Structure formats: structure tokens, C-alpha cells
């Protein structure tokens, strides 16, 4: 297919058959409903419809819609010409997400998924390698930050497939990785929106002390008291605290 690749949509289509097979075979899909974000020219989709129970794909590029409809005529395939970020998520059956997403909207898509985590069980998502390293980073790692804490609140995460830039067309300027998410069923009874804002506040100036970031929102004496209660130094920095401690901090300060 001759296609006018759109930089505005961040189009880099996965071409490598070996990588495609690794993605599709990573988890059993025979009895699963799959949601694919950005099927592109359908290289991954074509195998997904053969391996899974049902595939629902969201494609924003109207030029690709007739091509995909012609290429993939499987009865278990549903194609939506729709922006996933603007779509309403309300499924009767939980789905597995499989996606090769544009780098420039990675965070937007991830947080759309996190906000609707109850509709999904697992996800395999292709991201820029640098983002993958941030997603899986633990406290005291140089890659550890608000994305690490926020993402790990919703899911257990690991990097499972390294994908060189040569596996795509057009070829991007960076390497990628597939990240595996297992969404947690036991997320605490917590105000998720408020917690995510709290984490953003904690990491607002990552190189500064945590207390310095928090004092813009909370009373300084209360911050000192809570840090002392948790046996944390007043000098502690955001990247030195793990997810479980952040959850306790949130409860104590609110």
C-alpha cells in the first residue's frame, strides 16, 4: 500500500514479522477480547484476529480505514474510525490492550488507560525505550519519577521485548520496547485523581527536597510531622521514596 505517512499522527508502522509474532504470542489470546490502538497498515492486526477471540481497533487516520476494511475481513474484527483519546470507554467484557502508540502522546494514552483500568486486564504497549525504562524504574533509579509511581500504582509492569528502530517504517530516531502491564484488581479505596495530582506535586522539582515541593500545598509543620512519623529525613528527595510509602504519605497528609 502506498501511504502518505503523517508526522502529525506520529506514524511509524511496525514491519518486523519476528517482533509481531513475539508480541502476539507473549500471552495466550485464544479466549480474549483485544483492543488495538492504531492498527496502521494492519501488520499486527492481521495476526491478532487469527489468535484472539475478538479484536476492536481504533484508527484515527481516515485514509487507512478503507485499506484496513479491505485487508482484514475477519468476522471477529471491528474497526472504529475514532480517536482513542476522545472515545468513551464502557465495555461489558474486559479487554487486553495491544498497541504501538505514537511517542508524542504516550503519556496521554497511558493515563487514559489508567483512568479506565477497570475495563482492562492486561496490556502490551510499544513505547520509546526511554519511556519503558521510566515505567519500570524503582526508587533510587535515575529513571524513577512521577510516571514510574503513577503507572505502578495501577499495574505490575515489566519490559519484555526490545525493538530496534530498524523494525519500523518510516524509521524513527529512537529504539523502542514493548512493556507488559498486569492491571491490579485490588487498588485501594483512594481518590485516584487526587492521588495522581499529589504525585505530580511530589515530583514537581525532582532534584529538590520532597518537603520543598509539598510546602506549596501542605502546611510545613504537618509535612515535618508526617515525615518524622514515617522515619523519613526532612532532606529526603522524591526519587528516594517507593510507591507504598507515597500511598501512606498521601493518606497522612490528606
Curated annotation (Swiss-Prot):
Which positions are annotated as binding S-adenosyl-L-methionine?
A: 12, 14, 38, 59, 83, 100
Cellular compartment(s) = Cytoplasm
Q: Which GO terms describe its cellular component?
A: cytosol
Check the record and name the Gene3D superfamilies matching this protein.
Ribosomal RNA adenine dimethylase-like, domain 2 (1.10.8.100), Vaccinia Virus protein VP39 (3.40.50.150)
List, alphabetically, the PROSITE patterns matched.
RRNA_A_DIMETH (PS01131), SAM_RNA_A_N6_MT (PS51689)
Name the reaction it catalyses.
adenosine(1518)/adenosine(1519) in 16S rRNA + 4 S-adenosyl-L-methionine = N(6)-dimethyladenosine(1518)/N(6)-dimethyladenosine(1519) in 16S rRNA + 4 S-adenosyl-L-homocysteine + 4 H(+)
The record's section on CDD domains has: AdoMet_MTases
Task: Give the main location.
Answer: cytoplasm
Give the enzyme's EC designation: 2.1.1.182
According to its UniProt record, this protein's enzyme class is transferase
Keyword flag Cytoplasm: yes
Classification via Pfam families:
RrnaAD (PF00398)
What UniProt keywords apply to this chain's record, in alphabetical order?
Cytoplasm, Methyltransferase, RNA-binding, rRNA processing, S-adenosyl-L-methionine, Transferase
What is the top-level taxon of the source organism?
Answer: Bacteria
The Gene Ontology terms for molecular function here are: 16S rRNA (adenine(1518)-N(6)/adenine(1519)-N(6))-dimethyltransferase activity; RNA binding
Q: What does the protein in this record do?
A: Specifically dimethylates two adjacent adenosines (A1518 and A1519) in the loop of a conserved hairpin near the 3'-end of 16S rRNA in the 30S particle. May play a critical role in biogenesis of 30S subunits.
What PANTHER family does its record include?
Answer: DIMETHYLADENOSINE TRANSFERASE, DIMETHYLADENOSINE TRANSFERASE-RELATED
Entry's NCBIfam families? ksgA
The similarity comment for this entry is: Belongs to the class I-like SAM-binding methyltransferase superfamily. rRNA adenine N(6)-methyltransferase family. RsmA subfamily.
Q: What is this protein called?
A: Ribosomal RNA small subunit methyltransferase A
Starting at the broadest rank, the lineage of the source organism is: Bacteria, Bacillati, Mycoplasmatota, Mycoplasmoidales, Metamycoplasmataceae
Amino acid at each position: 500500500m502506498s501511504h502518505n505517512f503523517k508526522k502529525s499522527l506520529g506514524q511509524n508502522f511496525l514491519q518486523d514479522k519476528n517482533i509481531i509474532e513475539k508480541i502476539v504470542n507473549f500471552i495466550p489470546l485464544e479466549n480474549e477480547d483485544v483492543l488495538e490502538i492504531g492498527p496502521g497498515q494492519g501488520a499486527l492486526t492481521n495476526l491478532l484476529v487469527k489468535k484472539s477471540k475478538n479484536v476492536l481497533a481504533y484508527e484515527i487516520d481516515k485514509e487507512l480505514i478503507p485499506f484496513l476494511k479491505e485487508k482484514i475481513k475477519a468476522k471477529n474484527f471491528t474497526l472504529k474510525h475514532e480517536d482513542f483519546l476522545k472515545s468513551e470507554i464502557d465495555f461489558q467484557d474486559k479487554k487486553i490492550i495491544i498497541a504501538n502508540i505514537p511517542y508524542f502522546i504516550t503519556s496521554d494514552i497511558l493515563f487514559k488507560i489508567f483512568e479506565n483500568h477497570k475495563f482492562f486486564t492486561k496490556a502490551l504497549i510499544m513505547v520509546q525505550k526511554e519511556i519503558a525504562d521510566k515505567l519500570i524504574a524503582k526508587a533510587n533509579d535515575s529513571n524513577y519519577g512521577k510516571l514510574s509511581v503513577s503507572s505502578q500504582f495501577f499495574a505490575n509492569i515489566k519490559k519484555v521485548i526490545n525493538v530496534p528502530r530498524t523494525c519500523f517504517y518510516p524509521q524513527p530516531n529512537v529504539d523502542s520496547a514493548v512493556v507488559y502491564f498486569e492491571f491490579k484488581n485490588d487498588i485501594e479505596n483512594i481518590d485516584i485523581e487526587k492521588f495522581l495530582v499529589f504525585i505530580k506535586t511530589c515530583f514537581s522539582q525532582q532534584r529538590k527536597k520532597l518537603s520543598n515541593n509539598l510546602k506549596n500545598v501542605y502546611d510545613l509543620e504537618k509535612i515535618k510531622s508526617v515525615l518524622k512519623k514515617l522515619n523519613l529525613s526532612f532532606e529526603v528527595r522524591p526519587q528516594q521514596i517507593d510507591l507504598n510509602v507515597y500511598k501512606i504519605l498521601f493518606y497522612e497528609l490528606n
